[in-house]
């Protein structure tokens, strides 16, 4: 499959405007197709980013730190791959290092990479956890995502306050309940 040109994408937006009964040549909509393409270029910029590159800078002189490291409250907005409607929420990540750590901002960058793609929350949860596990090789990783989905609030069942929670664990978090419990206690308070 070849990538459409910018002109083809812009024309597709014009076609959608016509489909919903709008006139793409009226004054208020003249620049809308181009604005939509500019927005989508930014919103879906995660496709052009490499997680391995983000996690490439590791710190090995960590004073043998082998306790829980967590970053809580990472805000994100993504788009569901089923309806192309936004879902937004919060990600909590924890890991227990083995021989290296990563700058804490890198964890937020990973969330941004996966959020800026068409997604389902379940897959995004696994992608974040597994990418940290594969690149840092910690003793374990825990990820929890809590999100509101526009596909449930703007259409269908019209539930605008329902929050979906997903969790994924690797290593010691998957194997030992005490670590999961500590992680969930920490993230439930938020």
Swiss-Prot record:
Gene3D superfamilies documented for this protein: 1.10.286.10, 3.30.1130.10
Keyword Transmembrane helix in record: no
A Pfam family it matches: GTP_cyclohydroI
Protein name stated in the entry: GTP cyclohydrolase 1
Gene Ontology biological-process annotations: one-carbon metabolic process; tetrahydrobiopterin biosynthetic process; tetrahydrofolate biosynthetic process
Annotated pathway: Cofactor biosynthesis; 7,8-dihydroneopterin triphosphate biosynthesis; 7,8-dihydroneopterin triphosphate from GTP: step 1/1
Record's subunit section: Toroid-shaped homodecamer, composed of two pentamers of five dimers.
EC code: 3.5.4.16
Annotated catalysed reactions: GTP + H2O = 7,8-dihydroneopterin 3'-triphosphate + formate + H(+)
Family of this protein: Belongs to the GTP cyclohydrolase I family.
PANTHER family: GTP CYCLOHYDROLASE 1, GTP CYCLOHYDROLASE I
NCBIfam families: folE, PRK09347.1-2, PRK09347.1-3
Entry keyword Zinc: yes
């Amino acid at each position: 499959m070849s990538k459409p040109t910018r002109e083809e994408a812009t024309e597709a937006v014009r076609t959608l405007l016509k489909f919903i009964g709008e006139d793409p040549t009226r004054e208020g909509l003249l620049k809308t197709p181009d604005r939509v393409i500019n927005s989508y270029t930014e919103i879906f910029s995660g496709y052009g980013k490499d997680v391995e590159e983000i996690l490439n800078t590791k710190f090995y002189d960590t004073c043998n730190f082998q306790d829980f490291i967590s970053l809580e409250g990472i805000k994100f907005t993504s788009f569901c791959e089923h309806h192309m409607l936004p879902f937004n929420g919060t990600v909590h990540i924890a890991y227990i290092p083995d021989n290296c750590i990563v700058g804490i901002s890198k964890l937020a960058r990973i969330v941004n990479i996966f959020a800026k793609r068409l997604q389902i929350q379940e897959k995004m949860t696994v992608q974040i956890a597994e990418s940290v596990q594969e690149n840092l090789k910690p003793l374990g990783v825990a990820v929890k995502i809590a999100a509101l989905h526009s596909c449930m609030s703007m259409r269908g069942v019209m539930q605008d306050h329902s929050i979906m929670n997903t969790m994924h664990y690797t290593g010691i978090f998957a194997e030992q309940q005490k670590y999961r419990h500590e992680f969930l206690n920490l993230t439930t308070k938020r």
